[in-house]
């Protein structure tokens, strides 16, 4: 099974569908997908890190791997992008493929309660959400992304936490992401 080998051997929960696991168990598959997009003409490729944060990974019992999933996902995409640039240069061309670090909405909402009988209940705080996004953003930057892509978020508080985390990651960096 592609999902539950390597660091996930003996996982207590079903991991199929947790695509970020593939960054650690089958990086060659993820890289091949990036290369297909590049070969088709993509100038920007997204990392396989949409749910590589400890909140989303807690659904699978994989929260301890979230940072590693994000970093490795970025490094795989960076490698594919750099190889495309090298290949172009070998025939006298210049090509830049940008790597966008995918940051999804997490599996939890800060604005809505998952418990209809307790509308004030929230399983996570704003600070928890901020920490999840901060860890993910830092790992993506360290892995080599050019862009941080906060995507498909429907919850304004989740977006606010993500933007605060990304902004704080920029502090002290010479190069803006």
Predicted regions and their residues:
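Domain-level signal for soluble alpha/beta catalytic cores
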Residues: 1-177
């Amino acid at each position: 099974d592609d999902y539950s080998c390597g660091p996930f051997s003996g996982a207590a929960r079903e991991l199929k569908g947790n695509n970020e696991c593939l960054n650690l168990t089958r990086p060659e598959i993820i890289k091949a997908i990036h290369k297909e997009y590049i070969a088709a003409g993509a100038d920007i490729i997204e990392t396989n890190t949409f749910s590589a944060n400890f909140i989303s990974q807690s659904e699978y019992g994989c929260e301890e791997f979230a940072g590693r999933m994000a970093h490795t996902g970025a490094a795989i995409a960076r490698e594919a992008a750099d190889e495309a640039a090298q290949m172009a240069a070998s025939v006298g061309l210049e090509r830049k493929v940008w790597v966008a670090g995918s940051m999804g909405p997490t599996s939890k909402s800060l604005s809505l309660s998952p418990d209809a009988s307790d509308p004030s209940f929230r399983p996570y705080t704003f600070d928890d959400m901020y920490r999840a996004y901060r860890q993910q953003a830092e790992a993506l930057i360290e892995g080599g992304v050019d862009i941080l892509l906060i995507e498909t978020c429907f919850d304004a508080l989740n977006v606010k936490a993500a933007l605060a985390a990304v902004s704080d990651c920029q502090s002290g960096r010479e190069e803006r992401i």
